């Protein structure tokens, strides 16, 4: 199933089983997603389902976006997302219809993608879990230095992908195969076991697990 749902991370809590076992869960608010466009091979070169979620003040929506939402006959949302479709997926779904959290009622595991918390510019120890160097015994300036970053005249360069200091976080991260603990259709809530990327209030993309 390629069709997913756009939600918003509320935060973490825990629930207890009948045996008294504590299960850490992340609460995701997944209000009904409104279909704004159906992309097809004939017109767009690929097949996909475009949706919006949440709401946005009218004075914060530009004319192009306002026209797009009006054409679909839906209320303006806080963004636009697409789900690629395969084969006959998406049959029966029309522009203006809604997709709710109930699509996961029979799903046992999901993949959740979000934007991780930004940590700014960080050194190699924090960013890549490097070991620090000696605190003494001749070392006075390089306690948290990464060490050598290359070899010699040959190859005479630093290889691409070398783990060094730099921007940490604030990138898209996907956590796979999270157990679905509870689906609360009445309150548009989805509870999954464990944590998901990002800070509370951040948008997340929920799909059925590909490795389930």
UniProtKB/Swiss-Prot annotation:
Which InterPro entries does the UniProt entry name for this protein?
A: Ribosomal_uL3 (IPR000597), Ribosomal_uL3_bac/org-type (IPR019927), Ribosomal_uL3_CS (IPR019926), Transl_B-barrel_sf (IPR009000)
Keywords on record: Methylation, Ribonucleoprotein, Ribosomal protein, RNA-binding, rRNA-binding
Name positions with the PTM N5-methylglutamine: 153
Q: Which Pfam families match?
A: Ribosomal_L3
Biological process GO terms, please? translation
Q: Which GO terms describe its molecular function?
A: rRNA binding; structural constituent of ribosome
Under PROSITE patterns, the record lists:
RIBOSOMAL_L3 (PS00474)
What's a single GO CC term here? cytosolic large ribosomal subunit
Give the superkingdom in one word.
Bacteria
For this chain, the Swiss-Prot or TrEMBL PTM comment says: Methylated by PrmB.
Q: From the UniProt entry, list the residue stretches annotated as the region Disordered.
A: 134-155
Family label: Belongs to the universal ribosomal protein uL3 family.
Function summary: One of the primary rRNA binding proteins, it binds directly near the 3'-end of the 23S rRNA, where it nucleates assembly of the 50S subunit.
| Subunit organization | Part of the 50S ribosomal subunit. Forms a cluster with proteins L14 and L19.
Which HAMAP family does this chain map to? Answer: Ribosomal_uL3_B
What name does UniProt use for this protein? Large ribosomal subunit protein uL3
Q: What is the lineage of its organism?
A: Bacteria, Pseudomonadati, Pseudomonadota, Gammaproteobacteria, Alteromonadales
Q: Gene encoding this chain?
A: rplC
């Amino acid at each position: 199933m390629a069709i997913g749902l756009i939600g918003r991370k509320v935060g973490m809590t825990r629930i207890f089983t009948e045996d008294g076992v504590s299960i850490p869960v992340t609460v995701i608010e997944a209000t009904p997603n409104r279909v704004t466009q159906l992309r097809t091979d004939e017109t767009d070169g690929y097949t996909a389902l475009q949706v919006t979620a949440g709401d946005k003040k009218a004075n914060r929506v530009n004319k192009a976006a306002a026209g797009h939402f009006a054409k679909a006959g839906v209320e303006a949302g806080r963004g636009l997302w697409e789900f690629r479709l395969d084969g006959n997926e998406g049959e029966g779904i029309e522009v203006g219809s809604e997709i709710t959290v109930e699509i996961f009622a029979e799903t046992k595991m999901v993949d959740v993608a979000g934007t991780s918390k930004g940590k700014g510019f960080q050194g190699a120890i924090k960013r890549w879990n490097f070991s620090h160097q000696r605190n003494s015994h001749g070392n006075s300036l390089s306690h948290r230095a990464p060490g050598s970053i290359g070899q010699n005249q040959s190859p005479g360069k630093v290889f691409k992908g070398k783990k060094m200091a730099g921007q940490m976080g604030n990138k898209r991260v996907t956590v796979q195969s999270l157990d679905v603990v509870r689906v609360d259709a009445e309150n548009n809530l989805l509870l999954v076991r464990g944590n998901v990327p990002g800070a509370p209030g951040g948008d997340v993309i929920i799909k059925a697990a590909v490795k389930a």
